[in-house]
């Protein structure tokens, strides 16, 4: 029984606590899956370009993103990748030749256009920043007097002592007294003027004729003035 149990453990039976069989070759299965996907992708690309050629359409040319690499680095990379299978190597070569047509990689002309556009944007930004830094012709640097005044205005004010506060309070009281007296004098003059006007009107309204009858002319003038107002 013990030998059978050990045998099941060696075979990877999970019932006896051993490692499941489907996890023993997980790394190999992953490699096979990657190779299969690369082969399928290369076949799809090859069939697509064959179809374009058959229909007479132009085949887009894509530069490899590794075209600018040095030959030494390319040879070293080829030596390191010698362990890979022929199918994966062929698919990778197709991907490099097509420049990642299905992967969304940019071609050489598109990359140049993007680089030119980025250079133009940088030049525009530099020109704008230079224009901002240039002073306007109308603006002039402040003079020494202006700088001195600005410095004096920015200085914190010193607190007033008792004598200065008393003088300021006295000045304010004197100013308020003068304003109050001026207002009183103005009101007095207005009242006197109104009294004179009223007395004059009363005198005109009390005028009579030789026979003692009230004179109608001032009364009519008063009514007309009220209507005009």
UniProtKB/Swiss-Prot annotation:
Q: Where is the composition biased (Basic residues)?
A: 19-29, 37-48
InterPro entries to which the protein is assigned, alphabetical: Fyv7/TAP26
**Keywords in alphabetical order:** Coiled coil, Nucleus, rRNA processing
Q: Where is the composition biased (Acidic residues)?
A: 77-97, 110-124
The residue ranges flagged as biased composition, category Low complexity, are 98-109
Q: Name one Pfam family in it.
A: rRNA_processing
Q: Which GO terms describe its cellular component?
A: nucleolus
- Region entry Disordered, spans: 1-229
Query: Can you cite a GO biological process for this protein?
Result: rRNA processing
Record's compositionally biased regions (Polar residues): 203-214
Q: Where in the cell is it found?
A: Nucleus, Nucleolus
Q: Output the superkingdom of the source species.
A: Eukaryota
Q: Which residues form a coiled coil?
A: 160-208
Basic and acidic residues composition-biased segments:
52-76, 146-193
Protein family per UniProt: Belongs to the FYV7 family.
**Biological role:** Involved in the processing of the 20S pre-rRNA.
Please name the PANTHER family in this protein's record: THYROID TRANSCRIPTION FACTOR 1-ASSOCIATED PROTEIN 26 (PTHR15657:SF1)
Could you identify this protein by its name? rRNA-processing protein FYV7
Instruction: Give the species.
Output: Yarrowia lipolytica (strain CLIB 122 / E 150)
Q: Which gene encodes it?
A: FYV7
């Amino acid at each position: 029984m013990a030998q059978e149990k050990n045998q099941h453990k060696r075979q990877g039976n999970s019932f006896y606590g051993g490692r499941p069989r489907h996890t023993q070759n997980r790394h190999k299965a992953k490699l096979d899956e990657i190779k299969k996907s690369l082969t399928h992708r290369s076949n799809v690309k090859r069939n697509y370009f064959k179809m374009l050629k058959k229909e007479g359409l132009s085949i887009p040319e894509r530069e490899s993103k590794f075209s600018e690499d040095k030959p030494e680095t390319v040879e070293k990379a080829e030596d390191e990748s010698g362990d890979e299978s022929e199918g994966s190597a062929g698919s990778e070569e197709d991907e490099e030749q097509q420049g990642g047509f299905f992967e969304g990689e940019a071609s050489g002309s598109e990359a140049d256009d993007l680089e030119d556009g980025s250079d133009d944007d940088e030049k525009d930004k530099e020109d704008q920043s230079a224009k901002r830094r240039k002073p306007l012709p109308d603006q002039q640097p402040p003079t020494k007097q202006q700088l001195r005044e600005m410095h004096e205005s920015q200085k914190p004010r010193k607190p007033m002592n008792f004598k200065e506060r008393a003088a300021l309070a006295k000045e304010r009281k004197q100013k308020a007294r003068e304003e109050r007296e001026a207002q009183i004098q103005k009101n007095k003059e207005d009242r006197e003027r109104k009294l004179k006007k009223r007395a004059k009107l009363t005198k005109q309204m009390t005028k009579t004729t030789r026979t003692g009858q009230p004179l109608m002319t001032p009364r009519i003038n008063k009514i007309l003035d009220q209507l005009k107002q």
